[in-house]
């Protein structure tokens, strides 16, 4: 007997059906805004992540050398891949480029609530627009997907920040701005809620801030709770921070217009840990705090395409983690029903396989979503009826030799146990808009 690997999950039909419903809600929301689906490979060159993603990702790579001696990794995230794709065909693509993709990713990290080593995300990205409306649009897609699932603003919140505010503040407060590693300081902010205060301030010190300045910096960013609170930050940070504050205000104003503003709050302690992020960043959390992991995350990465050798191309994206999203939906009581149902079970008795199969085909032709099963194991009448009950068949149609001699089928309602006979030529009826059931013939 072989056990599954730690952090790698199996999904049985009921759970997978619910997961598919959630994925469909996200993709449908993105499709309504004009995002087009792409597909991407499971393997990329390891050097791409070493160069572009940052040390945290690199430490978690499933990396190996292939038979050609190339260093390759199972994809831990999608953004570098889509950046590579944009560079490859950038001149042929109309901008803004709006793509989405749902697929698994792999990171060797500590398994815990909402975190696995194989995990699923739906990435939603816009390339070619630096306007605040692009940031607002991806926020709106995320908000629409969540509300389509039945969640409300009592269930989730987007914490919106700006990395140029954080980096600008660090440089403005530092005794020697040139000695400060702003990316390291921003990574420290990203870890703020995950480590104790002493370790957090130590990380800021390692980035080039003395202890007192690190505390001053943290006091400034943690005091911001509303848009109006940004005034003090702009005053402390100088021109660069003022420009970033103005950009953040514009994004939040656009989010209001897109209908996502009610779900957004300013949170400068949100940073996003990946080095390629540039401007506005955001994370979505369970408002109650019961689900600790972020449900959606995203932001701007305006420099990434150029770093791949392409033309300067602003970009912004968002992605939900399907595992923490499922926890949020379950906590809020909106996780889809995992109980599967079957519209019809065609039960054959005696030598009626051809007739039963023809009827099953006719029933499947009634609609794309109609589920029809029939016996493929040569089982007895009782065994077939028991199986029909186990798959939650709503209607059983008995095709027996004696029934056919009389030119009829027996139609059975599984919920009540009631049944009736129906002339063969009347089941299924021609031109009916609803699926025929026992109640139509009782």
UniProtKB/Swiss-Prot annotation:
It catalyses: tRNA(His) + L-histidine + ATP = L-histidyl-tRNA(His) + AMP + diphosphate + H(+). Residues 416-442 are annotated as: Disordered. SUPFAM superfamilies: Class II aaRS ABD-related, Class II aaRS and biotin synthetases. It is an enzyme of class 6 (ligase). Pfam families: HGTP_anticodon, tRNA-synt_His. The keyword Protein biosynthesis applies. GO terms for cellular component: cytoplasm. This is Histidine--tRNA ligase.
């Amino acid at each position: 007997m072989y056990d599954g690997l730690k952090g790698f999950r199996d999904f049985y039909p009921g759970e997978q059906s619910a997961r598919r419903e959630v994925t469909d809600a996200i993709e449908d929301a993105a499709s309504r805004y004009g995002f087009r689906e792409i597909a991407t490979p499971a393997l990329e060159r390891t050097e791409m992540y070493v160069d572009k993603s940052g040390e945290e990702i690199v430490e978690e790579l499933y990396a190996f050398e292939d038979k050609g001696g190339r260093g390759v990794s199972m994809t831990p995230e999608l953004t570098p891949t889509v950046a590579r794709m944009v560079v490859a065909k950038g001149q042929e693509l109309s901008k803004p480029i709006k793509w989405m993709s749902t697929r698994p990713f792999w990171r060797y990290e500590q398994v815990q609530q909402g975190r696995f080593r194989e995990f699923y995300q739906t990435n939603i990205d816009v390339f070619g627009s630096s306007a605040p409306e692009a940031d607002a649009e991806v926020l709106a897609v995320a908000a629409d997907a969540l509300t389509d699932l039945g969640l409300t603003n009592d269930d989730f919140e987007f914490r919106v920040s700006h990395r140029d505010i954080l980096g600008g503040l660090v440089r403005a407060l530092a005794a020697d701005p040139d000695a400060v590693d702003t990316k390291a300081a921003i990574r420290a902010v990203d870890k703020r809620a995950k480590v104790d205060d002493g370790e957090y301030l130590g990380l800021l010190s390692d980035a080039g801030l003395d202890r007192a300045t690190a505390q001053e910096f943290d006091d400034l960013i943690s005091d911001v709770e509303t848009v109006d609170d940004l005034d003090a930050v702009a005053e402390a940070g100088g021109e660069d921070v003022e420009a970033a504050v103005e950009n953040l205000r514009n994004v939040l104003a656009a989010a209001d217009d897109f209908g996502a503003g009610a779900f957004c709050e300013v949170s400068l302690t949100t940073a996003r840990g990946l080095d390629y992020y540039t401007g506005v960043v955001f994370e979505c959390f369970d408002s109650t705090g019961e689900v600790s992991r972020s449900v959606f995350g995203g932001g701007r990465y305006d420099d990434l395409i150029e770093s791949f050798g392409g033309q300067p191309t602003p970009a912004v994206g968002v992605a939900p983690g399907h595992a923490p999203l499922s926890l949020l939906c379950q906590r809020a009581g909106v996780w889809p029903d995992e109980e599967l149902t079957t519209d019809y079970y065609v039960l054959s008795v005696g030598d009626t396989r051809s007739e039963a199969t023809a009827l099953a085909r006719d029933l499947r032709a009634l609609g794309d979503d109609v589920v029809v099963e029939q016996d493929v194991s040569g089982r007895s009448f009782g065994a077939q009826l028991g199986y029909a009950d186990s798959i939650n068949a709503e209607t059983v149609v008995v095709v027996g030799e004696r029934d056919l001699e009389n030119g009829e089928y027996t139609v059975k309602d599984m919920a009540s146990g009631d049944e009736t006979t129906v002339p063969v030529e009347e089941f299924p009826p021609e031109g009916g808009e609803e699926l025929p059931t026992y109640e139509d013939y009782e």
